[in-house]
Amino acid sequence: MSAVQLYLASGSPRRQELLTQLGYQFERVVVDVEECHQPSETAEQYVQRLSRDKATAGVKKINATKTAVATMPVLGADTIVVVDETILEKPKDFNDAQRMLNLLSGRQHQVMTSVTVATVEREETQLVVTDVWFKTLSEKEIEKYWQSGEPQDKAGSYGIQGLGGKFITRIEGSYYAVMGLPLVETDVMVQNFLNL
């Protein structure tokens, strides 16, 4: 196994899978960042702040636990779903997921994923916005989907890469950003930090 090249400040199995798909060796660093939208923030500002907060929290945590200053970059990311200027994050319970999926049903929405790569010296953030269209969903489909367990840890209460993919009629943008990590943009940023 090759040497670790960067840290991932995320517990998301999908982000771990996608970073592995890019061929990077990484270590996970667990960070605790409060995800609370400020009234003055746009959706774009909010998701970018969260990815920056996660990456910089990772940098601080690594520096606090290592004897030498960490030189490896830390990658933080966050994904939100936006419909009618309403931000949809992870559902709290079935009623919340039902509300979200009913909002998305038969309509277009946006998935915003922000990725930040940071070190002590610098940071870079990139936002990728993808338009997604849903078919009209029945209450039975929503309930059955919730019972699958899939929507419970996903922004907007669905996963494009799983059962939720059957609700999607069209997509414009990055499929991988909807999953949680845009591959092209992430790869360019990481290569830039690693001088590859």
Curated annotation (Swiss-Prot):
Its cofactor is a divalent metal cation. Its EC number is 3.6.1.9. Keywords: Cytoplasm, Hydrolase, Nucleotide metabolism. The active site is at 78 (proton acceptor). One of its GO terms (biological process) is nucleotide metabolic process. It catalyses: dTTP + H2O = dTMP + diphosphate + H(+); UTP + H2O = UMP + diphosphate + H(+). The record marks 14, 79, 161 as: Important for substrate specificity. It is found in: Cytoplasm. GO terms for molecular function: dTTP diphosphatase activity; UTP diphosphatase activity. It comes from the Bacteria. It is an enzyme of class 3 (hydrolase). Gene3D superfamilies: 3.90.950.10. It holds the Pfam family Maf. One of its GO terms (cellular component) is cytoplasm. HAMAP family: Maf. NCBIfam families: maf. Belongs to the Maf family. YhdE subfamily. Nucleoside triphosphate pyrophosphatase that hydrolyzes dTTP and UTP. May have a dual role in cell division arrest and in preventing the incorporation of modified nucleotides into cellular nucleic acids. This is dTTP/UTP pyrophosphatase. It comes from Photobacterium profundum (strain SS9). The lineage of its organism: Bacteria, Pseudomonadati, Pseudomonadota, Gammaproteobacteria, Vibrionales.
